[in-house]
Amino acid sequence: MINIKVVIIIFLSGFYFISNAQSIIGEWETFDDLTGDKLSVVEIYNINDIYFGKITHLFEDSLDSVCDQCEDGDYNKPIIGLVIIKNLIKDDDEYNEGTILDPNNGKSYKCYMELIGTNKLKLRGYIGFSILGRTQYWQRKI
């Protein structure tokens, strides 16, 4: 007879994988808009139901190691570890009201995200209205 503890563990671990697959929490690979080359890995996490993202890995040596274009508290901070996504709030299937920092130019933009399937993330950064912006697609790091 199967041990009841084993059955419970298997049952609960299934819920973990299902809920994690439907969440933006995790590591995401970012890509260059023109070449499609991998640029970085961003870890998205949540604190008190507010979502943030920080760069954990760079694929290209050509990227500056510090954010010398950033302003205020992010000026000259190392790119690795830099929190570039701030204050996203889940609203149904989208994550809104946040900002994203472009460490190449030091500018922050309003942003929203939407999970497409389980392993693709649509991210839109914009100024003012969402039609004035740029969309990127990130791939879940597996």
Give residue spans per PLM region.
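Short, hydrophobic/aromatic-rich segments at coil-to-beta transitions
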Residues: 22-27, 91-98, 119-122
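Bacterial Sec-dependent N-terminal signal peptides
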Residues: 1-23
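Short polar/acidic secondary-structure junctions
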Residues: 33-35, 103, 114, 128-129
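K/E-rich alpha-helical interaction surfaces of small helical-bundle regulatory domains
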Residues: 24-37, 136-141
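C-terminal/domain-terminus segments
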Residues: 103-119
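Generic beta-strand structural signal
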Residues: 46, 90, 115-116, 140
